[in-house]
Regions:
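Glycine/serine-rich loop-strand microenvironments at binding/catalytic pocket rims
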Residues: 28, 32-40, 46-47, 67, ...
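Class I S-adenosyl-L-methionine
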Residues: 70, 103, 216, 298-305
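Generic domain-boundary/flexible-linker signal
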Residues: 36, 45-48, 148, 239, ...
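Conserved AdoMet/S-adenosylmethionine-binding subsite of the radical SAM
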Residues: 117-276
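Conserved Radical SAM active-site core
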Residues: 44-184
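Short glycine-enriched, charge-decorated loop/helix-capping segments at active-site entrances
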Residues: 51-53, 201-207, 278-288
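Auxiliary Fe-S-binding modules of radical SAM enzymes
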Residues: 1-19, 234-323
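Flexible, acidic/Gly-rich N-terminal and inter-domain linker regions that tether
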Residues: 1-63, 71-73, 92, 323
């Protein structure tokens, strides 16, 4: 178990990403930049200190972070009106002395390195819950297949101990990374964000061609279990044409070989984390009526179901997903 991964979170007792009660590892690094992403700390592989300025005691009152930083006043710590407001990552060396010195927890480190064995020690703690609920381990991100060697070894270790494995991937990776995971993955979860390639590039930073091609190839594998998701975003992909084209793709290009299609309603989440990382939250000004939007999603779900695609609103119903 020599591979080392970079993660930004481990969640125990999750129930949304795969069947049963699960432990979910979130790996850092993603090839896309979706505007609605709720986990900006997962976009880069780099371990980053984030700033929660409201907690800062002040440069004059405290200033311990500045004293601890090897670069001092000319370093990456940026103050405004006596408060630490951001960290210049171009200057930051990643020593994390600022975080270690802060008594108010105004600096949070996003990310840590972990070996497969260390991850397995976390996973084994909940083995009894997996067995009783039909649960297991999910690896998400970021994009877990950017760290395919680590993810493959982790899943192989889980398999050896009888633990169900689920990979939640953007599929914006080469087929060789996916192929490496096939023998050790019990369930796949992937998104179809939108069908228009230029609009996909505008809102995610990349074309959807690679994703769609990988989905077609996955659908050709006998017995492969795949949950598809559409994150439904107001004013972005919630139009009738996009939903119709998505259904056409599933039925014609994937031959309907999808276990479940899940429609996930947009939630305004992660804004505080964007601020901590000095990044703009691009969905801040999105306005919509929640009740109307939910009815719209329900209508889309009924239309997908009417075309023979098993469709849920949300992720909570778990029926034949268990292996």
């Amino acid at each position: 178990m020599n591979n080392v991964g970079t993660i930004f979170n481990i969640q125990h007792f999750t129930i949304h990403d795969g069947p049963g009660i699960r432990t979910e590892l979130f790996l850092k690094g993603c090839p896309l930049q979706c505007r609605w992403c709720s986990n900006p700390e997962g976009l880069t592989r780099r371990i980053q200190p984030g700033v929660y300025r409201k907690k800062c005691l002040g440069k004059r009152t405290c200033g311990l972070c500045l004293s601890a930083c090897p670069q001092g006043e000319k370093g990456p710590l940026t103050f405004y009106r006596n408060k630490l407001i951001k960290i210049d990552y171009e200057k930051c060396t990643g020593c994390m002395a600022c975080e270690e010195s802060c008594p108010a927890e105004a600096i949070k480190v996003w990310g840590r390195r972990i070996t497969v064995e260390e991850a397995m020690q976390e996973i084994r703690r909940d083995k009894g819950y997996y067995d009783r609920s039909g649960g297991g381990v999910t690896v998400s991100g970021g994009e877990p297949l950017l760290q395919a060697d680590f993810t493959e070894e982790l899943f192989r270790s889980c398999r050896e101990e009888g633990i169900h494995t689920c990979c939640e991937s953007s599929l914006w990776v080469g087929w060789e990374e996916i192929e490496k995971m096939l023998p050790v993955t019990d369930l796949w979860i992937a998104d179809i964000k939108m069908m228009d390639p230029e609009k996909h590039r505008e809102y995610t930073g990349g074309s959807n061609a690679k994703i769609l091609e990988n989905l077609k190839r996955l659908s050709e594998i006998p017995g492969l279990r795949l949950i598809l998701r559409i994150p439904v975003i107001p004013g972005v992909n919630d139009d009738q044409e996009n939903m119709d084209r998505t259904a056409d793709f599933i039925l014609q290009e994937m031959k309907g070989r999808v276990q479940t299609l899940q429609l996930l309603s947009f939630m305004r989440m992660g804004e505080e984390k964007y601020t901590s990382l000095g990044m703009p939250y691009q969905m801040k000004d999105v306005r919509f009526r929640r009740d109307y939007f939910q009815r719209k999603i329900r209508r889309f779900a009924d239309e997908f179901s009417g075309r023979g695609i098993h469709t849920l609103v949300g992720t909570r119903e778990k029926e034949e997903e268990k292996s």
